[in-house]
Amino acid sequence: MTAFIFITGGVMSSVGKGIATASIAKILQARGLSVTAIKVDPYLNVDAGTMNPYQHGEVYVTADGGETDLDLGHYERFLDVELSKSHNITSGQVYLSVIDGERRGVYLGQTVQLIPHVTNEIKARIRAIAKEGWDAVVIEIGGTVGDYESLPFLEAARQMRLEENGNVVFVHVAPVPILDVTDEFKTKPLQHSVMELRRVGIQPDIIIIRSTRPITNDVKAKVSLFTNVPQNLIFNSFNVDTIYRVPLILDEQGLGRMLTELLKVKVNEPKWDDWVNLVNSMVNATDEVKVTLCGKYVKLRDAYISIVEAIRHAAAWLRVKPRIIWCDSEEVEKDPDLLPKMNTDAYIILPGFGARGVEGKIMAIRYARENNIPLLGICYGMQLSVVEYARDVLGLKDAHTTEVNPNTTHPVIDITPEEKSINKLGGTMILGDREISITEGSILHGIYGSLRIRERHRHRYEVNPAYFKQLQEAGLVFSAMRIDVPRVEAIELHNHYFFIATQFHPEFRSRLTRPHPLFTALLKAALARKMGLESPYTGVKP
């Protein structure tokens, strides 16, 4: 039977439940179990697609086109699996389904209520994933215990403990802060969060204490006394040098052994050698490479978390230390001299939408192109690379994307045909995996080592086919195209040290154990240029 591990959080949000969930799943996977993870989000949005990145962080796109919570990215990166959009359950989805069912007469005249109809819908969605054949399903319940919107999900989890014959474990994650004045750990907030959990009928089996530094045995004893959780089932996730070390420190404390004992499952000895080597490579590297990330949401780093992690994955395999420089494209518009002051080794032009900060991104693209600095553009970053090239190389000074200037005389970027008749925002973009053909002999071909790939997408606009010929005749290489429609998927320059931009999002396929080749190539080029060598991809000198 499938085991279910529910992860709850106390005291405040953003305490690290997502990493704890991914770590627990990884600990079980390291013992030979097949494991998947689910994120429950109690908000009423159907998905994360239309939410402000400053409120929600990155929208993580799944292979099947789901616009999901960024925690699904952590799950995929830790487990090296592909999750579907069904692995992100929101209140909006649940209530929409229940109300639709009531309208269609599914409930045969019953009075439709939170219990049992909403809770049954929640349980059905969790069990549908379990039926795929997993040994264990780890479910992170978003938000904080005590939030009104979380109550139906906690109630559904409580019911599942009754119904699943001992195959359910509850793990509670909560912080124990340190007062600066006394340098003392304070456990009272955690104690109260467990009291809130008990009020809804849930006694946690395991507690993970989040702290800035390792807790003392006295703290563990005090938490045990007031939460009714034995000391050997209390673990500490303290701040470490990389999130990929968290499963290692929790397993060293015995979490894997105790969890499998509670679930009464037979497992193998954990295999951590490859993971440990990569983590050590990540934290012990000394050669530094500076990568500038240029976009408009840089004040909240979580808005681009998959790109940051993809850089770290590639750096770990190359045994270098990435230094990430954040570049606010709006600030570049005010002061273009910021670009040379950064003295960077490589640029990534970040994805995004809208007019704000666009000219700053275009300035950064031009600076990288004219100064032979390695550049990778992603999604909007590719579209604006085309705009910059059309303006500066083709001489089409009014060239733009119709997303920003619908009246431009040279719409080198225009809305895709399939998007023109759509008048809703949510879930209507070109989303998820698409099959792509790579141009034989291109730089991209050498990087991938393949002529046919699949990558994830999230966009409405495309390179305007009316400008294909002009752009190509001016030296812009279309190195990848969609298989099913005439759509540019990647561009590159052969007279530049390293200049590649993609319509797709390579960051969503990067893993610590399997970094994405585009990020590895960017860092290789940046390192070679830093050492004064010819480009390993074009032969161009620095």
Swiss-Prot record:
Positions with a binding annotation for ATP: S14, V15, G16, K17, G18, I19, D71
Binding, L-glutamine: Y54, G352, Y380, G381, M382, Q383, E403, R460
Glutamine amidotransferase type-1 domain: residues covered: 297-532
InterPro entries: Class_I_gatase-like (IPR029062), CTP_synthase (IPR004468), CTP_synthase_N (IPR017456), GATASE (IPR017926), GATase1_CTP_Synthase (IPR033828), P-loop_NTPase (IPR027417)
EC number: 6.3.4.2
Top-level EC class as recorded in UniProt: ligase
Pathway: Pyrimidine metabolism; CTP biosynthesis via de novo pathway; CTP from UDP: step 2/2
CDD domains: CTPS_N, GATase1_CTP_Synthase
Domain of life of the native organism: Archaea
Keyword Magnesium found: yes
Listed GO biological process terms: 'de novo' CTP biosynthetic process; pyrimidine nucleobase biosynthetic process
Residues annotated to bind CTP: S13, D147, Y148, E149, K186, T187, K188, P189, L190, Q191, K222
Binding-site list for UTP: S13, K186, T187, K188, P189, L190, Q191, K222
Chain residue ranges for the region called Amidoligase domain: 1-265
GO molecular function, one term: identical protein binding
Keyword hit for Magnesium: yes
Active-site residue numbers: C379 (nucleophile), H505, E507
Keyword set, alphabetical order: ATP-binding, Glutamine amidotransferase, Ligase, Magnesium, Metal-binding, Nucleotide-binding, Pyrimidine biosynthesis
Family: Belongs to the CTP synthase family.
Subunit structure: Homotetramer.
Other facts noted in the record for this chain: CTPSs have evolved a hybrid strategy for distinguishing between UTP and CTP. The overlapping regions of the product feedback inhibitory and substrate sites recognize a common feature in both compounds, the triphosphate moiety. To differentiate isosteric substrate and product pyrimidine rings, an additional pocket far from the expected kinase/ligase catalytic site, specifically recognizes the cytosine and ribose portions of the product inhibitor.
NCBIfam families recorded: PRK05380.1, PyrG
Known function: Catalyzes the ATP-dependent amination of UTP to CTP with either L-glutamine or ammonia as the source of nitrogen. Regulates intracellular CTP levels through interactions with the four ribonucleotide triphosphates.
Name of the featured protein: CTP synthase
